[in-house]
Amino acid sequence: MSNKDNDLDDDFSLFREAVQGIKKLPQDTIVQQPNRNTKQKEIKRISREASDSEFYFSDEFVPLLNEEGPTRYARDDVSTYEVKRLRRGVYVPDVFLDMHGMTQQEAKRELGAMIAYCVKNEVHCACVQHGIGKHILKQKTPRWLAQHPDVLAFHQAPLEFGGDGALLVLLSIPEK
């Protein structure tokens, strides 16, 4: 065993000789500053989404929606079969937006942000819960959704997703 101890002592002494005179580098103590651009990008993103909601969701434009039966809408290029699948709950929403207690302005902003999120993350189906309440958001939400270019169709949600107080929204996702 003393042979191994001697070998270790020799190794340590060789190492000490090799690193003798080495000094610590001064740049090893520099602290990285956080990137300030992330805050600016977040502020720009929020303002862009707010301006998008103002651009797409007009209160003055009233699209021609079917007044009879459940609330539904489909663009001209969307098959009626897709609307049936939406009505039956074949499409399961990946994103839920609950607008209970929001003002019209907040609801517009959140709706625009949800659609932007869905397009960015390639989510094809979302559920918007507008509630029943005083019927303000219940009337306005379908009008706003019908104006947005990324909305292919929407239909009153099945009971498991909110029934009369919710809409299932089918979104178009641009191909990359």
Swiss-Prot record:
GO BP annotations, alphabetical order: rescue of stalled ribosome
Residues in Smr domain copies: 97-172
GO terms assigned for molecular function: RNA endonuclease activity; rRNA binding
Keyword RNA-binding in annotation: yes
EC number from the UniProt entry: 3.1.-.-
Swiss-Prot/TrEMBL keywords: Endonuclease, Hydrolase, Nuclease, RNA-binding, rRNA-binding
Entry-linked InterPro entries: Smr_dom, Smr_dom_sf, SmrB-like
A matching Pfam family: Smr
General function of this protein: Acts as a ribosome collision sensor. Detects stalled/collided disomes (pairs of ribosomes where the leading ribosome is stalled and a second ribosome has collided with it) and endonucleolytically cleaves mRNA at the 5' boundary of the stalled ribosome. Stalled/collided disomes form a new interface (primarily via the 30S subunits) that binds SmrB. Cleaved mRNA becomes available for tmRNA ligation, leading to ribosomal subunit dissociation and rescue of stalled ribosomes.
HAMAP family for the chain: SmrB (MF_01042)
UniProt similarity note: Belongs to the SmrB family.
Binding partners and assembly: Associates with collided ribosomes, but not with correctly translating polysomes.
Protein name per UniProt: Ribosome rescue factor SmrB
Organism listed in the record: Vibrio vulnificus (strain CMCP6)
